[in-house]
Amino acid sequence: MSVNVNRSVSDQFYRYKMPRLIAKVEGKGNGIKTVIVNMVDVAKALNRPPTYPTKYFGCELGAQTQFDVKNDRYIVNGSHEANKLQDMLDGFIKKFVLCPECENPETDLHVNPKKQTIGNSCKACGYRGMLDTHHKLCTFILKNPPENSDIGTGKKEKEKKNRKGKDKENGSVSTSETPPPPPPNEISPPHAVEEEEDDDWGEDTTEEAQRRRMDEISDHAKGLTLSDDLERTVEERVNILFDFVKKKKEEGIIDSSDKDIVAEAERLDVKAMGPLVLTEVLFDEKIREQIKKYRRHFLRFCHNNKKAQRYLLHGLECVVAMHQAQLISKIPHILKEMYDADLLEEEVIISWSEKASKKYVSKELAKEIRVKAEPFIKWLKEAEEESSGGEEEDEDENIEVVYSKTASVPKVETVKSDNKDDDIDIDAI
């Protein structure tokens, strides 16, 4: 079924159509992903490379994307509904496809990585302008320009160079291809020609250009090493995640990197172990303050994930081992902070407290930590009993208290559900 490219236009005879996006969820657990089955057809209707809308979804959702161009597979990590992605595609079309003047999708992108600009030209109304490059996708477009885009010196100059090369091989220059001499008033001075030739002679060697080329190489390398990383052992992948988080902290951007961290953990297929890495990098003796500061980071891993919550508790044990003198007496308070922040569930905490493990810390320290945690564990169990006891009180509705003249204390009798018309003989009580 096809839909209008510009879905704000309700005209059924609108000439610009595209297929409705089809999404298929594959995998389960940490490896769950959404494959956009007909992304090639959708992108063809929009006159854009299929990598652009896929990457746009990744930018908007904060998810990792994968491109298998050879097999036409375009993947967004995580589970996403087709309707949600279709609505998100409207945003991509509005920003990167529709003409700002006539709102028709007959546009071409003109990317100039050297000047870091993205131009937009419309074949319907003749509009020419520049795109706003503040969106994250623009960085990807600058590094991966469309094949039909005019890059660097442009197609004409490339064709000219190709012709020159062929002429040199043949040992002659075609007179039909020699352009007529320009008027005298338009002849450029010799030094201008030399400068232009120098620009074409070699690559741009400025520091900014070198940095861009290194970024392009690193992005390409990331794509090549994606499958290699998944072939590593779990321990090696956890170490990669540790280095990733540590680098974010050293660069001073850890506060806003929660989405990037969880995306990297999903890419490496070690999402459940993320809290173990985060505790080692982010927590020290000031852990109670840091729980509040980095709550969002941990919540992305621990929400509805009991396995991740258990790793968080193991990570807490490691932090206590490193700062035992300062933290051993504060165990109940730390657990309460994590519980109140919705990072831990009652069931997980109680299960953890019942068995000491020597996998992450010594057996003696693991037991001591659980002994120190007993006040909080007891409070959790009592609160659970009170909540279950409140339900039992509702079952006592059919009990009625009858006072006797001869007895000094009230007598409890059960009132039967079938009411009889016989009068109660008070003297017989």
From Swiss-Prot:
Its main location: cytoplasm. The keyword Ubl conjugation applies. There is a cross-link at K411, K416 (Glycyl lysine isopeptide (Lys-Gly) (interchain with G-Cter in SUMO2)). Residues 143-216 are annotated as: Disordered. PROSITE patterns: W2. Residues 153-170 have a biased composition (Basic and acidic residues). It is found in: Cytoplasm. GO terms for biological process: formation of cytoplasmic translation initiation complex; formation of translation preinitiation complex; regulation of translational initiation; ribosome assembly. The keyword Ubl conjugation applies. The modification Phosphoserine is found at S10, S227, S387, S388, S408, S417. SUPFAM superfamilies: ARM repeat, Translation initiation factor 2 beta, aIF2beta, N-terminal domain, Zinc-binding domain of translation initiation factor 2 beta. Residues 231-390 form the W2 domain. GO terms for cellular component: cytoplasm; cytosol; synapse. The modification Phosphothreonine is found at T225. PANTHER family: EUKARYOTIC TRANSLATION INITIATION FACTOR (PTHR23001), EUKARYOTIC TRANSLATION INITIATION FACTOR 5 (PTHR23001:SF7). Component of the 43S pre-initiation complex (43S PIC), which binds to the mRNA cap-proximal region, scans mRNA 5'-untranslated region, and locates the initiation codon. In this complex, acts as a GTPase-activating protein, by promoting GTP hydrolysis by eIF2G (EIF2S3). During scanning, interacts with both EIF1 (via its C-terminal domain (CTD)) and EIF1A (via its NTD). This interaction with EIF1A contributes to the maintenance of EIF1 within the open 43S PIC. When start codon is recognized, EIF5, via its NTD, induces eIF2G (EIF2S3) to hydrolyze the GTP. Component of the 43S pre-initiation complex (43S PIC), which is composed of the 40S ribosomal subunit, EIF1, eIF1A (EIF1AX), eIF3 complex, EIF5 and eIF2-GTP-initiator tRNA complex (eIF2 ternary complex). Interacts with eIF1A (EIF1AX) during scanning. Interacts through its C-terminal domain (CTD) with EIF1 or with eIF2-beta (EIF2S2) (mutually exclusive) through a common binding site. Interacts through its C-terminal domain (CTD) with the CTD of EIF5B. Interacts with FMR1 isoform 6; this interaction occurs in a RNA-dependent manner. This is Eukaryotic translation initiation factor 5. The gene is Eif5.
